[in-house]
Amino acid sequence: MELKGRTFLGYRRDNGRVGIRNHVIVLPVDDISNAAAEAVANNIKGTLALPHPYGRLQFGADLDLHFRTLIGTGCNPNVAAVIVIGIEPGWTGKVVDGIRATGKPVEGFWIEQNGDHNTIANASRKAREFVQYASELQREPCDVSELWVSTKCGESDTTSGCGANPTVGEAFDKLYEQGCTLVFGETSELTGGEHLVAARCANDDVRERFQAMFDRYSAMIDRHKTSDLSESQPTKGNIEGGLTTIEEKALGNIQKIGKRCRVDGVLDKAETPTGPGLWFMDSSSAAAEMVTLCAASGYVAHFFPTGQGNVIGNPILPVIKLCANPRTVRTMSEHIDVDVSGVLRREINLQEAGDQLLEMLLRTANGRHTNAEALGHREFVLTRLYESA
């Protein structure tokens, strides 16, 4: 597939970014504001609440990550407008101010000294205005280079490294050549193959930052593991699917970054890239956490190759699933957007599989719902660094 000159119909935001969805979200700052946020979403059709279990008595780097994730989620160009609800005005205002910098409509409400009833009523009135505002926004032609695409795999097996992951790599190579902004992560799943990623880094500075980030993550795992990471890395499902060591899993994981991409930069969790290219983000390998971090970093579409089958979705980031395992494609067909099992049967080659994935990306960018969206998978899971005070 020739991508040069290809366009899609996206939503141009005030800060210049382009989204492929037009959500109005109700974002709770903390766990005790979930009920109010969900009540607003129940009141106003066209809004989406993002409940989560955190936001109280966090501190230090963990609190910084909490704010960065919430603000980044609201700033994502797939979001047209945001209602923020918190228990008190200070932290609520911090999230509102961070999102307001994008120029999009955002309003904050707090429950202290107002109560649930008044907060829900006032937030619902503003949410109705935001939904009507969003409903009048129009898609416009945008160059394919304006797409920000993330990737993370899940429930991997031998078909992942042989079929689905290299398919993502083929697509990434072509998107990279067009100047798209791409990201991969899953720090622990590079174990044993980290030298291959380091060799792909654009310069010594990027290489040193990547190695430092990998070493920091490895040290954290060493501090907290027992004798090994059995049943975690690789998972029991990975082992049953034929991946018996973390090194095997890593070599398959790295297939997702293609052959011609170089690693242009390194991101902390939920950090926004500063330019196009392929970025590495320090992140967990837990699917819902990683995809949530990608959304908070500003990515608008996600490639999710799976072997044994994973049902992950996200409230604002469309997750495009592809699979090369014919059994999974048959038994979990409602979850798979792109069937690339033909690669293993030698019915199609990897370039053709990559083109199928790119075609699905453009269809998704133009408004087609992914299977995860259609099935209502909206996993929104925040990453924690340590326990609360």
UniProtKB/Swiss-Prot annotation:
A cellular component annotation (GO) from this entry: cytoplasm
Top-rank taxon: Bacteria
Keywords: Cytoplasm, Lyase
EC number per UniProt: 4.4.1.24
Pfam families for this protein: GD_AH_C, GD_AH_second
UniProt-annotated location(s): Cytoplasm
GO MF term list: sulfolactate sulfo-lyase activity
Enzyme class: lyase
Catalyzed reactions: (2R)-3-sulfolactate = sulfite + pyruvate + H(+)
GO biological process, alphabetically ordered: D-galacturonate catabolic process
UniProt KW Lyase keyword: yes
Keyword Zinc: no
Entry's family note: Belongs to the UxaA family.
Subunit structure: (2R)-sulfolactate sulfo-lyase is composed of a SuyA and a SuyB subunit.
PANTHER family in UniProt: ALTRONATE DEHYDRATASE, ALTRONATE/GALACTARATE DEHYDRATASE
Record function comment: Together with SuyA, desulfonates sulfolactate to pyruvate and sulfite.
Protein name: (2R)-sulfolactate sulfo-lyase subunit beta
Species whose genome carries this gene: Chromohalobacter salexigens (strain ATCC BAA-138 / DSM 3043 / CIP 106854 / NCIMB 13768 / 1H11)
